[in-house]
Amino acid sequence: MTNSNGEPAFKPGPRVWIYRGFLAAVILGTAALGWYASRLAGSTLAATALPSSSPLATSRPSSTAAPLTQPALVSETAEPREPIVGQEGTLVFSARRDGRTHLWAYIIGDPSPRQITFGEWDDRDPAIDPLGERIAFASNRRGYWDLYLLDLGSGEVRALTETPGYEGHPTWSPDGRWIAYEAYESGDFDIWILPVSLDQEPIRLTNHPANDLSPAWDPNGRRIAFVSERDGGRDIFLADLDRPDDRFQNLTHTAELEEGDPAFSPDGSRLAYVQYGFGFPQITTAPLDGEIQSTVRGQGRKPAWSPQGEVLAAILDSPHDSQIVSYVADGAHARRIGFPVILDLGHIDWTPFDLRQPVMQLAASEQAAVPLYEVATDAPAGPGGRITLKALPGVEAPNPMLSDAVDEAFLALRERALRELGWDFLSTLDFAFAGINDPLPPGLTYRDWLYTGRAFAFSLSAVQAGWIEVVREDFGGQTYWRVYVRAAEQDGSLGEPLRDHPWDFEARFEGDSQAYDQGGLEKTRIPLGYYVDFTRLAADYGFERLPALPNWRTYYHGARFHEFVHRDGLDWESAMLELYPPSALITPTPFQTPTPTPTRTLRPTPTPWWWRWLTPTATSTPTPQPSITPSPAP
């Protein structure tokens, strides 16, 4: 467009040219970033699956008549995959199935792991000797937690310790003649050393009032790493066996973080451990030659080095299960190689030896699993085929009933808890079934699982009596709780010592503003004695813990640590429809909505003009005068 002189009607000013140049730079920069991102994505290591994606046989009961029938351990359709660099040998770990924790072995390249110990007890904390011939582990097969030795050639198991109390977490010396382990005695953990030949008395390595636990023996033989709270926080310490004086050295010195699970690299030059304090555990590695310079490798706990030191295997937890993953030990990129495992996956050890033959022999002794309980449901009642409620005999609760789909699971859990704890923990409940119109404590929601008949809440009076401890666990921005119940017998024959600091809800009422805002604080000291992990026990029978509600820091009941639900894969609405017709789930209106009535708005009325001219006339008011009061006559 031009003017009458043939010149452009609009000439761009300097600001317009600057704006156009800036816009062109933004467009070119965006294109360059897109090209660079595509090149970067093409060069990033892709996540690699473990040679098997076959799940370990689950311990969760289903709603069938035989809820825990054991599936085949080896999938018929699974095919071995080529192992990635640094993967060879055999992984040995503990995992929970059919209500018990036992040892499992996974040969790299096989489609699935195999169970190698069996029985109505728990086996865990496996450690393979340097020659791949024996496995040291902890077990409560005789009631108390002791150390045992499994001969892989003969399958023979012999006891290394037979003491009242607790021993666990063994680790081998490089020559295979000694085992270091943790023992709970006089109210705290200490590190001991035991000759495998049992020709000498155990040697006490640490003797400190604070907890010393989780030992790991240096492959070079002269150092033992362990976790200690002697400096206030939980740090990684190093014990030099050649220095009787000034033997212990704090390697981490992190007041704001806690560390655990130390593991030496095969050549002893690096140490892997776990850092806590970010809302999730982080696998960290650090060289031991000079000042500690740690590098985060990924999320997880219980790290184990591959035989060549190129890969770190670890356990990655979710609220209800675990899986084995691994990370490249040298490099910024992680390779996840996990297969899913149900619940409570424990300590991992990695040996360079192919233990296929002894593992197959041990796995051949496996027997058919006995179901933890049998489900017997009545025929659905009513026109909608809804499930009925069943009374819970001997249980005290406002409504001692549960859905017919889960009542057998609860009764079996109650009986198991009685055996494990030595007292009837589930005989009294705060809630079992809650009617659709029954009020719940402040902080709980209308869509609570207690309304479904599939959930229960144990009595909080046990918490007030000091028989319950809860440990906070965060997953993906949600807060969960692990519940520990104190055993009736405190001689070590029931339960085990606590290893983590429980949460103190009462701290928010003690005048600390930070504790009030956070809904409490961790207890400074771990309570003494022996406890049973009730969260794990409930999961054996299909009862899951629930996440805390967003209001839990304000409302105590919103923490929901005492509520457990048997979902059977159902969401809340589907579970409610097992008991109620759809019309009953419409949110009720608590009162009739008022209908607004229109009201006339009064308008000001003008004052007549003649009233505006009237001036008020003052009215005289007589002023009272004082009078003289005559004096009385004498």
List the predicted regions and their residue ranges.
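Sequence signature of WD/YWTD-type beta-propeller architectures
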Residues: 2-7, 12-376, 628-632
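Extracellular/periplasmic catalytic domains that process cell-envelope and extracellular macromolecules
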Residues: 85, 447-453, 555-557
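Active-site acidic/histidine clusters and adjacent loop/turn architecture
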Residues: 350-430
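Second-shell loop/turn segments in exported
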Residues: 392-404, 443-445, 515-527
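Acidic helix-start/capping segments at beta-turn-to-alpha-helix junctions
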Residues: 422-444, 551-558
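Structural recognition of the beta-strand scaffold that forms the well-ordered cores
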Residues: 425-428, 455-460, 545-548, 562-563
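Short, surface-exposed glycine/acidic/tryptophan-bearing loops
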Residues: 438-459
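Catalytic cores and adjacent binding grooves of peptidoglycan-active enzymes
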Residues: 464-594
